[in-house]
C-alpha cells in the first residue's frame, strides 16, 4: 500500500499492436470514417456492412475494398437554333468520394459514354414495338458500357489509389440518379406508378410493400402480361440492365432526386399551379389576376441578398429553369400570405422544411424524425386543395416520392450529394462547351476526345501540384533551372482565389457570392473591403462629423465615444444576457467617454466567411458572402443589408443572435489601435417562438423612447467573442392581406414596413440557424 503523497507509477508502455476496443488498425480507421469523417446514418452503415458480409462470404474477396458505382444519365440540348441537337450523356462517380467533393463540382464526376437516341418517322414514333425497342436499347447499352466492370464485381481487381498504394477492389452498382421519367424507364414500370413500391397508381400514398427483383420475378411466374401491367404497373417484356450484374437490384439503387421530385415537381409544377387554380375558383378570373399581380409585386419588392435571384417581372415567365424554382421557394410564402387560407401557407411551409431538411449536409436520426414530421404535416394541410375542388386526388408520383426519402437516406446518406443538380451543371463542361468547340459535323467523336483531354489535364494538375511543380511563375521556374534566381520566394502566376479548372461557379444574378477553397474554420470571420472608395467617385465622408452628416445621424460622435469607452475599459466584459449589449455604457456620463472626431475610412461592403457545408461551398465547406452598405448600388439606389450579430450567447441558432441593419462600414485609428466598425440599427424579436403559419421568426425595428431608431456602433470583424457580425440576414416584409402600393420597390423594402419575417428559406445555412 503506497504512502499518501507518493507519485503514481509511470504507465506501462503500450504495445504498437494494441488496438484495444478494435481488432486492428483497419477496424479503427473504418469506425473513424463512418462516425467522424463521413458521419453516416446508422442504416447506411448497416447496409454497407451487409454488402461487405456478402463480399466476405467469398474467400477470394476477403480484404478487398468495396467501390460503389454511382450512375446518372440525362438528356440535354446543346443548340435549339441549329436543329434541336440532343445528347444523352452517361455520368459516373464512385461512392468512396466524400460528399463535399461531389458537391464542390470537382472532377469526381466524369462522362463515360453517350447513350443512343433512335430516330424514326412520325408514323412509327408511337408504335409500341418502336417504343419497346428504345427502352430495351437503353438497358442493353448500359449493360454494354458497364461490362468492363463486371469481372471486378466478383473477383478483386487491382487498382492504384491516390496514396500510391495498390489495393484489391470489388466493384458494385450503387445509387442511380434519375428524374421520374427516367426512373420509370430504369425500373421497367408503367408511368404514374411508383418505381420503389407496389402502391396502386390510383392511391400511391397507401402503405405497400417495396418492389424488388425477387418479387417481380415471382409475379412473372403467375401473372400474364396484361395483369402485370394493369394490377402492378410492371412492363413484363423488358429486362433491367441490373439483372446482368451481381448484388444489383434496380428498385433499390434509384437515388432520391430533390431537384425534379421536390423543387420542380411538388413545389413548382404542383403547389404553385394549384394556388392559381384556387384563386380562380374562389374569386373568378378577373379578381384572381388582380391578386396574382399583387403576388408578383410582392416578389419583386423583396430586398436583395447575395445569391438571391431577382424576379423583375414576378413569377410570370414562360420557361422555368431549376434555378428559377429554387429562387422562388425562398420568397414565395410571404408573397401569398393573406391571399390564401392558412392551410395553404402551412402546406408550403411543410414542403419547404422537408426540402431544406433533406438538403442538409449532415442528417441524423433526429433530422429523419423531422423529415417524417414535415411529410405528415404536408399530407395533412394539402387536403385544402382537394376540399376546395382544385384537384380531385393526390396520387402523384413525384409527391409520393417524399414518403420514401427517410428509407433511401438510410441506404445512401445525405441526398444533396446525389441530386441531379450535380449533373445539370456538368452538362455545361462535359457536353455543351465541347460541342461548341467542335466542327458541328459528327461532333460526338470530337466531344469525347475533348473530354478525354480535359480529364488528363485535370489529373496532370493534381499530380504537378502534389509535387510542388506549379509554385512561382513560368519565368521564375526557368530562371531557377538556369541558376539565375536569387530569391525563390516569388509570387505565383495563378490567383489563389480563382476556382479550380472545370468548376462551376453557380452564381445567381451576378451577385457577390463565392465559395471558399480554404480549410474548414468553424468560427465565422468578417472583414471590411480591401480598398476605400475614391472620394471623388463616391463622395464618401472622410471624418466623423462628415459621416454623421452623410448618414443624417447627429448622434454619431456620441456613439463613437461610447463605443471607445467599452473598448478601452480594462475590465471590459460583455453581458451576453442583455437584450442589447450596447446599452451597458449608457449609464456612464458621456463626459467620461473618450473623444474622437478625427479621420475615418468608409467602406461600401464587407465579406463574411463562415462554415456552410449545406450550401454551395468549397471542399472544406467554407462560403463567402458580401454584405453591402453603400449610397449607390448598381447605379440605382442605396443598399444597406441586414446581418446577424453574435451576442456571445451559448444558445444555438437565432436565440443567440441579434438582427440588425448596417448603415455604414468604417474604420478609424485611436491611440494606435485600428477599429473596424459598423453602424447598425436594431430589430426586436417579437414573441418567443417562430410564426406558426410560416415557421419564420418575426422582428420589428427597435426605437428609443423618443421614437428614434436604436443605432449602435459594433465591431465589423471578429475581435471578441461577442458583439460582432456573424453573417448576412434576409428580411421579408409581412404584407398581411393588404395590396402592396405600386411605389414600393426592393430599394425601400427595409424602410416601409412595421414588421418583417427573418427569411430562413433564403439559403440552407440560414435555415439551420433561424429555424
Indicate residue ranges for each PLM-predicted region:
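N-terminal regions that are enriched for targeting/export leaders
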Residues: 1-53
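Acidic, metal-ligating active-site segments
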Residues: 78-119, 676
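Short helix/loop capping segments that flank catalytic or ligand/cofactor-binding pockets
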Residues: 79-82, 90, 100-103, 202-207, ...
Amino acid at each position: 500500500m503506497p504512502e499518501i503523497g507518493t507519485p503514481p507509477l509511470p504507465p506501462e508502455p503500450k504495445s504498437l499492436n494494441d488496438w484495444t476496443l478494435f481488432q486492428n488498425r483497419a477496424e479503427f480507421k473504418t469506425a473513424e470514417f463512418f462516425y467522424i469523417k463521413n458521419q453516416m446514418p446508422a442504416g447506411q452503415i448497416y447496409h454497407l456492412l451487409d454488402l461487405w458480409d456478402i463480399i466476405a462470404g467469398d474467400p477470394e474477396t476477403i480484404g478487398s475494398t468495396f467501390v460503389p458505382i454511382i450512375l446518372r444519365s440525362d438528356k440535354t440540348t446543346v443548340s435549339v437554333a441549329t436543329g434541336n441537337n440532343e445528347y444523352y450523356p452517361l455520368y459516373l462517380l464512385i461512392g468512396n468520394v466524400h460528399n463535399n467533393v461531389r458537391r464542390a463540382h470537382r472532377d469526381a464526376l466524369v462522362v463515360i459514354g453517350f447513350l443512343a437516341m433512335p430516330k424514326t418517322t412520325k408514323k412509327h414514333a408511337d408504335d409500341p414495338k418502336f417504343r419497346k425497342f428504345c427502352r430495351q436499347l437503353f438497358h442493353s447499352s448500359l449493360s454494354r458500357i458497364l461490362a468492363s466492370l463486371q469481372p471486378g464485381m466478383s473477383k478483386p481487381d487491382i487498382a492504384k489509389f491516390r496514396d500510391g498504394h495498390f489495393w484489391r477492389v470489388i466493384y458494385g452498382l450503387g445509387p442511380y440518379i434519375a428524374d421520374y421519367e427516367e426512373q420509370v424507364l430504369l425500373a421497367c414500370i408503367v408511368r404514374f406508378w411508383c418505381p420503389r413500391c407496389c402502391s396502386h397508381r390510383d392511391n400511391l400514398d397507401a402503405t405497400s410493400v417495396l418492389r424488388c427483383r425477387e418479387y417481380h420475378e415471382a409475379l412473372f411466374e403467375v401473372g400474364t402480361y396484361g395483369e402485370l401491367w394493369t394490377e402492378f404497373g410492371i412492363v413484363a417484356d423488358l429486362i433491367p440492365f441490373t439483372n446482368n450484374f451481381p448484388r444489383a437490384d434496380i428498385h433499390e439503387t434509384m437515388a432520391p432526386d430533390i431537384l425534379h421530385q421536390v423543387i420542380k415537381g411538388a413545389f413548382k409544377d404542383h403547389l404553385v399551379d394549384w394556388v392559381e387554380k384556387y384563386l380562380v375558383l374562389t374569386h373568378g378570373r378577373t379578381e384572381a389576376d388582380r391578386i396574382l399581380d399583387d403576388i408578383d409585386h410582392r416578389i419583386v419588392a423583396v430586398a436583395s441578398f447575395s445569391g438571391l435571384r431577382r424576379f423583375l417581372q414576378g413569377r410570370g415567365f414562360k420557361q422555368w429553369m431549376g434555378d428559377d424554382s429554387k429562387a422562388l421557394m425562398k420568397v414565395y410564402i410571404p408573397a401569398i400570405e393573406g391571399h390564401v387560407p392558412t392551410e395553404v401557407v402551412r402546406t408550403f411551409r411543410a414542403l419547404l422544411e422537408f426540402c431544406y431538411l433533406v438538403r442538409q449536409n449532415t442528417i441524423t436520426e433526429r433530422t429523419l424524425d423531422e423529415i417524417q414530421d414535415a411529410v405528415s404535416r404536408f399530407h395533412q394541410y394539402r387536403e385544402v386543395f382537394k376540399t376546395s375542388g382544385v384537384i380531385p386526388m393526390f396520387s402523384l408520383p413525384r409527391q409520393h416520392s417524399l414518403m420514401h426519402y427517410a428509407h433511401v437516406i438510410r441506404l445512401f446518406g445525405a441526398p444533396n450529394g446525389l441530386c441531379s443538380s450535380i449533373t445539370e451543371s456538368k452538362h455545361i463542361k462535359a457536353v455543351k462547351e465541347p460541342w461548341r468547340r467542335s466542327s458541328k459535323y459528327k461532333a460526338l467523336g470530337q466531344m469525347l476526345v475533348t473530354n478525354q483531354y480535359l480529364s488528363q489535364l485535370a489529373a496532370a494538375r493534381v499530380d504537378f501540384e502534389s509535387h510542388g511543380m506549379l509554385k512561382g511563375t513560368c519565368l521564375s521556374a526557368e530562371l531557377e533551372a538556369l541558376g539565375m534566381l536569387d530569391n525563390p520566394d516569388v509570387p505565383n502566376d495563378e490567383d489563389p482565389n480563382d476556382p479550380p479548372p472545370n468548376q462551376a461557379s453557380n452564381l445567381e444574378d451576378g451577385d457577390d457570392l463565392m465559395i471558399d477553397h480554404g480549410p474548414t474554420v468553424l468560427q465565422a470571420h468578417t472583414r471590411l473591403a480591401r480598398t476605400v472608395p475614391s472620394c471623388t467617385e463616391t463622395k464618401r465622408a472622410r471624418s466623423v462629423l462628415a459621416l454623421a452628416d452623410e448618414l443624417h445621424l447627429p448622434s454619431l460622435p456620441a456613439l463613437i465615444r461610447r463605443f471607445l469607452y467599452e473598448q478601452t475599459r480594462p475590465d471590459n466584459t460583455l453581458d451576453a444576457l442583455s437584450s442589447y449589449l450596447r446599452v451597458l455604457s449608457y449609464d456612464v456620463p458621456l463626459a467620461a467617454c473618450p473623444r474622437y472626431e478625427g479621420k475615418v475610412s468608409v467602406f461600401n461592403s464587407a465579406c463574411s466567411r463562415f462554415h456552410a457545408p449545406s450550401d454551395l461551398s468549397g471542399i472544406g465547406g467554407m462560403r463567402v458572402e458580401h454584405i453591402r452598405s453603400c449610397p449607390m448600388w448598381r447605379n440605382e439606389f442605396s443598399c444597406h443589408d441586414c446581418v446577424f450579430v453574435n451576442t456571445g450567447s451559448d444558445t444555438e441558432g437565432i436565440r443567440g443572435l441579434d438582427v440588425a441593419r448596417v448603415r455604414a462600414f468604417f474604420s478609424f485609428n485611436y491611440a494606435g489601435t485600428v477599429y473596424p466598425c459598423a453602424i447598425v440599427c436594431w430589430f426586436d424579436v417579437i414573441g418567443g417562438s417562430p410564426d406558426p403559419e410560416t415557421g419564420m421568426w418575426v422582428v420589428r425595428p427597435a426605437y428609443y423612447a423618443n421614437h428614434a431608431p436604436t443605432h449602435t456602433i459594433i465591431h465589423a470583424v471578429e475581435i471578441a467573442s461577442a458583439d460582432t457580425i456573424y453573417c448576412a440576414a434576409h428580411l421579408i416584409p409581412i404584407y398581411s392581406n393588404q395590396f402592396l402600393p405600386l411605389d414600393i420597390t426592393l430599394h425601400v423594402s427595409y424602410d416601409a414596413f412595421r414588421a418583417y419575417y427573418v427569411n430562413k428559406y433564403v439559403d440552407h445555412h440560414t435555415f439551420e440557424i433561424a429555424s
